[in-house]
Each structure stands twice: as structure tokens, then as C-alpha cells.
């Protein structure tokens, strides 16, 4: 983590410190404000890394979710490997990241629900929806 006092201004509350968490050529950003991305202890959280700072192309092979561990000096560890990873959520107990892998296409494709431990272990596929769903009324 790199201290960035230059990002604070006169409106910044006293005692607030600003740090840069990432380095490198690819932009990184928060996932989205209402997403459950913090572990219950607030010492670890998930952020988005990829070719676009805000918004994304879910087919971008550089796009991934990273775990930031503040107790390890802001160390970043990749959590997802798959192209199409989206909609991340940290479990209420803080042990897992749940996410979808979007390989959908009009009238075809697959949507997969996966999970991985925040330590990178116990990677599992939990459910797969393939092709058009009859209950949606699409052929």
C-alpha cells in the first residue's frame, strides 16, 4: 500500500488517510457499492481488476477478482481465473467468494455458479444452467 496524501483535499475528514492499493498497467476498481465484498472483520475485501476501471466486458481475459488483505499490507491475491467471472459476493462467514461465470449467448450458452475460499482453496462448481430454459418461454 502506498500512502497518497495528494488524493485528500480540504473536504477530507481529519484523521482520514488515503492509500493506493494497486500498481501496474491495468486499472482496478471497487466491484459495486451494494455488493457484499468485505469479510466480516473488514480486514479483507474483493476488488475488480481488468482492462476497464469502471464497467467491463465480461469476455475480457484480463478481468478478475482480487482479494485485498489489509493485515498483509494490502497484498492482492487473484481469486478468479475464468473468463466471464461476474457478480461476486463474500459469504456472511467470510470464508468464501461466490460468483457466476457468464458464458451465455442469445438462445444458448451456460451460466455457472462457483465458489472459492478467500485463501484460494476449495474451488468448486456449485450449479450449471445450460441452454435456453423452458420456463422462460424462449424457444
For each feature predicted by the language model, list its residue ranges.
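Conserved loop/turn motif of beta-propeller repeat scaffolds
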Residues: 41-42, 51, 94
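Asp-box/WD-like beta-propeller blade repeats and closely related beta-sheet repeat scaffolds
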Residues: 81-139
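Short coil/turn linkers that define WD40 beta-propeller blade boundaries
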Residues: 73-74, 121
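Structural motif
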Residues: 54-66, 106-115
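Residue position within the beta-strands of beta-propeller blades
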Residues: 44-48, 97-100
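Signature of short aromatic-glycine-proline-rich micro-motifs recurring in repeat-based ectodomains
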Residues: 29-40, 138-139
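A short helix->beta-strand "capping" segment at the edge of beta-propeller domains
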Residues: 9-29
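Predominantly five- to eight-bladed beta-propeller fold
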Residues: 1-13, 62-63, 110-111, 128-129, ...
Amino acid at each position: 500500500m502506498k500512502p497518497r496524501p495528494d488524493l485528500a483535499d480540504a473536504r477530507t475528514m481529519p484523521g482520514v488517510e488515503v492509500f493506493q492499493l494497486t500498481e501496474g498497467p491495468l486499472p482496478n476498481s471497487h466491484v459495486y457499492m451494494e455488493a457484499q465484498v468485505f469479510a466480516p472483520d473488514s480486514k479483507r475485501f474483493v476488488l475488480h481488476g481488468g482492462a476497464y476501471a469502471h464497467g467491463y466486458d465480461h469476455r475480457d481475459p484480463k478481468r478478475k477478482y482480487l482479494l485485498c488483505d489489509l493485515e498483509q499490507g494490502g497484498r492482492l491475491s487473484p481469486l478468479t481465473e475464468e473468463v466471464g467471472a461476474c457478480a461476486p459476493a463474500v459469504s456472511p462467514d467470510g470464508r468464501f467468494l461466490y460468483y457466476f461465470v457468464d458464458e451465455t449467448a442469445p438462445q444458448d450458452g451456460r451460466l455457472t455458479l462457483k465458489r472459492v475460499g478467500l485463501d484460494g482453496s476449495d474451488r468448486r462448481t456449485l450449479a450449471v444452467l445450460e441452454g435456453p430454459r423452458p420456463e422462460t418461454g424462449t424457444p
